[in-house]
């Protein structure tokens, strides 16, 4: 598991990002992302595998002081998380 945490000072109401499998993901590889607002789980993305098309994930983070993104990979899963946007 990998994670990144950011202080956002209660300035944002939502986050959006895109998820796709990386080109060298293994056949059985999967992954997903969990979004935490002040250490409370607010969104879990669908599981992404080798044949998954791009998906967009949106999470409500209204009133959060801290934002954490946690990446979970299994069996050679490799994901690209892109187009991350915070919305006021």
Could you tell me what each predicted segment is?
Residues 1-88:
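Gly-Asp-aromatic-enriched flexible segments
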């Amino acid at each position: 598991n990998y994670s990144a945490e950011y202080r956002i000072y209660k300035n944002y109401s939502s986050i959006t990002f895109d998820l796709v499998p990386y080109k060298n993901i293994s056949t059985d590889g999967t992954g997903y992302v969990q979004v935490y607002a002040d250490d409370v789980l607010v969104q879990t993305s669908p599981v992404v595998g080798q044949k998954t098309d791009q998906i967009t994930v949106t999470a409500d983070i209204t009133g959060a002081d801290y934002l954490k993104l946690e990446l979970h990979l299994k069996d050679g899963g490799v994901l690209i998380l892109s187009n991350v946007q915070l919305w006021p």
